[in-house]
């Protein structure tokens, strides 16, 4: 016997429609490339999104057509998010930090029909537009610009396009299982892979991220997604902000610590989301000018492991809760969030800090397990390390344009991470499977060593790689960026680890560099570091730390 309840479709258009109807006056603030701040509201965003959807339809676009964006976090990008997906098309966000060959590849692989771009990225598209045979139109997300038109004849001005739209356009009926948006992985090795999200997966993801034990979002919040909208849809915040009716602050291209500090204070931001390097910049800026935001209550840290020193500084100095989270493109992205349970209330400060270093527990909708190399499930005892597997409502089934059934293993997605899970379900990333150091039969976590290194007052960035070793097969090698004018030595760095890890885990050597190579999403390119420094211990007769 079936239940007798309504079955409404879970679609993206309904999110912005809800925001406009019940939170229409709530502000959406946008920092433009010029630095100018523009102000709108959810009602205006929804109206302009409908007009844009109408205009795209008049251009001949039909459901399931892909529309690419290459743009910063700004209000036009937000309008495109809702216009494209709401009309049944697929919004393909492109990371401009990819190599230009990769940008060409993903546009052609996605078979994008339209590319909408900020003027910042006009030189990139102008260089490659002749190599994009499927693209029928290029839209500059700004007012008409004669210089831009000279670079790319036929360029359409965004405001002109919206002006052609219909004020009375109504969101069409879309099946919740239809594709809504498309993101590509960072392509650390090989070409980027496409992950095609559905309306249903996106709405369910938004519901869960708003829950109290995830990000605890509400209409009273002012949300600042520092994480780019081209990086897994800004971790879903453009959708969850509309769902709860929060004020949304879009920071544009200026993501330095001083700019973010000023924006947080001026707009009363209560929650901000970004990667650790962003928060390092914010903390440095606030320490330098003595500022302290009165509104900020929590920051969400993902993308890479959050150092314990950062958690401590945010909490002890600024009274800000750090929500340590984990996810990936293939998980839309949220897989876990670290919020304490009832029995953690009485823990000591040091015990609470130790708990916060974990990436947290999966919310409803995601299941995790760890397995050994034979696929046997390992115990969730907080000690056993295994390959992390995931499944759930917003977890990938197949990569875009891949052979069906080639992505999963017995219905589970292999994340490529090595992790532990404790009896409460708290998951801790030990390393990427390809990065973990296997030394004399023991596993050494590069993540743990990097977290310790970054806590050193004279180190601003650090990476640890597995360097080949004649006796132990692999040993840890620290590659670090010193703070300006620091006279720190390799020996001093290695000695710094002495009371923090077991002796056999201490890096054999430390090398100082001007900067670490990173990919388009800010992740350190350890493959390049291994290529350059992987044999350095074979050429050295002894460890620097001996």
UniProtKB/Swiss-Prot annotation:
It comes from the Bacteria. One of its GO terms (molecular function) is ATP binding. CDD domains: ttLC_FACS_AlkK_like. It is found in: Cytoplasm. Pathway: Lipid metabolism; fatty acid metabolism. One of its GO terms (biological process) is fatty acid metabolic process. ATP binds at residues 235, 329, 417, 434, 438, 443. One of its GO terms (cellular component) is cytoplasm. It catalyses: a medium-chain fatty acid + ATP + CoA = a medium-chain fatty acyl-CoA + AMP + diphosphate. PROSITE patterns: AMP_BINDING. InterPro entries: AMP-bd_C (IPR025110), AMP-bd_C_sf (IPR045851), AMP-binding_CS (IPR020845), AMP-dep_synth/lig_dom (IPR000873), ANL_N_sf (IPR042099). NCBIfam families: PRK06187.1. This is Medium-chain-fatty-acid--CoA ligase. The gene is alkK.
């Amino acid at each position: 016997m079936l239940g007798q309840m309504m079955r409404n479709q879970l679609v993206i258009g309904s999110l912005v429609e809800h925001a406009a109807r019940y939170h229409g006056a709530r502000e959406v603030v946008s920092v433009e490339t010029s630095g100018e701040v523009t102000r709108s509201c959810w009602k205006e965003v929804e109206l302009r999104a409908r007009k844009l959807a109408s205009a795209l339809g008049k251009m001949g676009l039909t459901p399931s057509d892909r529309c690419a964006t290459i743009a910063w976090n700004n209000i036009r990008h937000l309008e495109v998010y809702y216009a494209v997906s709401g009309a049944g098309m697929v919004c393909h966000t492109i990371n401009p930090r990819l190599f230009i060959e990769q940008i060409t590849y993903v546009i052609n692989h996605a078979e994008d029909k339209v590319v909408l771009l900020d003027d910042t990225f006009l030189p990139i598209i102008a260089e490659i537009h002749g190599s994009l045979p499927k693209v029928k139109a290029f839209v500059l997300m700004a007012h008409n610009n004669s210089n831009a038109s000279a670079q790319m004849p036929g360029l359409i001005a965004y405001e002109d396009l919206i002006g052609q739209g219909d004020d009375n356009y109504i969101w069409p009926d879309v099946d919740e299982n239809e594709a809504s948006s498309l993101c590509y992985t960072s392509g650390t090795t090989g070409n980027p892979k496409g992950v095609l999200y559905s309306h249903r997966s996106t709405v369910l993801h938004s519901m869960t991220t708003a829950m109290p034990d995830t990000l605890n979002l509400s209409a009273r919040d002012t949300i600042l997604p520092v994480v780019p909208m081209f990086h897994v849809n800004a971790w879903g915040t453009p959708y969850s902000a509309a769902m709860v009716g929060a004020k949304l602050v879009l920071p544009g291209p200026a993501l330095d610590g001083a700019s973010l500090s000023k924006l947080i204070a001026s707009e009363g931001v209560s929650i901000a989301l970004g990667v650790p390097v962003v928060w390092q910049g914010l903390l440095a800026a606030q320490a330098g000018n003595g500022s302290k935001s009165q509104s900020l209550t929590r920051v969400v840290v993902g993308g890479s492991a959050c150092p314990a020193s950062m958690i401590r500084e945010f909490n002890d100095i600024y009274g800000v809760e750090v929500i340590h989270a984990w996810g990936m493109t293939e998980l839309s992205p949220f897989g876990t969030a670290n919020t304490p349970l009832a029995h953690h209330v009485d823990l000591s400060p040091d015990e609470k800090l130790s708990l916060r270093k974990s990436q947290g527990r999966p919310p409803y909708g995601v299941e995790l397990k760890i397995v050994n190399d034979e696929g046997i499930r390992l115990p969730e005892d907080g000690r056993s390390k295994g390959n992390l597997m995931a499944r759930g409502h917003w977890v990938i089934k197949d990569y875009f344009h891949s052979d069906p059934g080639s992505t999963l293993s017995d219905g589970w997605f292999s994340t490529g991470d090595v992790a532990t899970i404790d009896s409460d379900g708290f998951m801790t990333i030990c390393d990427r499977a390809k990065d973990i150091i296997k030394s004399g039969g023991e596993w050494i976590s590069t993540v743990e060593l990097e977290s310790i290194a970054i806590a050193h007052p004279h180190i601003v960035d650090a990476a640890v790689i597995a360097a080949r070793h004649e006796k132990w097969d692999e040993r840890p090698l620290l590659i670090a960026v010193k703070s300006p004018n620091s006279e720190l030595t390799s020996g001093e760095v290695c000695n710094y680890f002495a009371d923090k890890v077991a002796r056999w885990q201490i890096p054999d050597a430390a090398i100082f560099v001007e900067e670490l190579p990173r990919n388009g999403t800010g992740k350190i390119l350890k493959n390049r570091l291994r290529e350059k420094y992987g044999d350095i211990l074979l050429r050295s007769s002894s460890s620097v730390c001996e």
